[in-house]
Amino acid sequence: MNKGNLIENYAVALFNNAMVDNIQDKIFEEITSINRIITDNFDIREFLFSPIVNKNDKINAVNSLAKNIKISTIVQNFLLLLVKNSRIAILSNIVDAYNTLLYESKNIKIVQVISANKLQPKEQEWIKSRIEKELNQKTEILFDIDNTIIGGIVIKYDSMLQDYSIKGSLEKITKALKTVNIAV
């Protein structure tokens, strides 16, 4: 089984479990919080990800963490399953996949917008409204910065890529010039 399918399977299992009690949002908050704790704390991350540390010690650590931050039994059992199956290292990927499932269940499309500089709130709202109008669907926009695109924006969703960047335009021009045998 490839890693993508594995991640998706874990996310779907957790999501389906949360749906039983209609607590998908609560579970997302909890799993995101746990993931942030693990990601932000080097010692916890190294302890849980280490192949040398005994699984029982990891299980005790997860149980202690769950008790201290008061997470649901569903999330605690899910984390224990990941530890027992030596899959805790893919938790961040599972959280991302779960997030996608959560938005899909609400008919909200996740769209990534990349710009060369930080966009102003008015610009973000304008872009969001244009994308929602084009897709005829509510969106959750993730704004990222990549100064290598020079200017403009790149829009990604599903398997679509819309490149309105200066870098993308220059690459298209370069490719076109190469096809007509003009040295670049």
Curated annotation (Swiss-Prot):
SUPFAM superfamilies referenced in this protein's UniProt entry, alphabetically: N-terminal domain of the delta subunit of the F1F0-ATP synthase
Membrane topology term: Peripheral membrane protein
Pfam families referenced in this protein's UniProt entry, alphabetically: OSCP
Main location: membrane
Superkingdom to which the source organism belongs: Bacteria
Coiled coil feature spans: none
Keywords from the named record: ATP synthesis, Cell inner membrane, Cell membrane, CF(1), Hydrogen ion transport, Ion transport, Membrane, Transport
Listed GO CC annotations: plasma membrane; proton-transporting ATP synthase complex
Compartment(s) of residence: Cell inner membrane
GO molecular function, one term: proton-transporting ATP synthase activity, rotational mechanism
Subunit structure of this chain's protein: F-type ATPases have 2 components, F(1) - the catalytic core - and F(0) - the membrane proton channel. F(1) has five subunits: alpha(3), beta(3), gamma(1), delta(1), epsilon(1). F(0) has three main subunits: a(1), b(2) and c(10-14). The alpha and beta chains form an alternating ring which encloses part of the gamma chain. F(1) is attached to F(0) by a central stalk formed by the gamma and epsilon chains, while a peripheral stalk is formed by the delta and b chains.
Annotated function: F(1)F(0) ATP synthase produces ATP from ADP in the presence of a proton or sodium gradient. F-type ATPases consist of two structural domains, F(1) containing the extramembraneous catalytic core and F(0) containing the membrane proton channel, linked together by a central stalk and a peripheral stalk. During catalysis, ATP synthesis in the catalytic domain of F(1) is coupled via a rotary mechanism of the central stalk subunits to proton translocation. This protein is part of the stalk that links CF(0) to CF(1). It either transmits conformational changes from CF(0) to CF(1) or is implicated in proton conduction.
Family (UniProt): Belongs to the ATPase delta chain family.
Entry protein name: ATP synthase subunit delta
Organism: Rickettsia peacockii (strain Rustic)
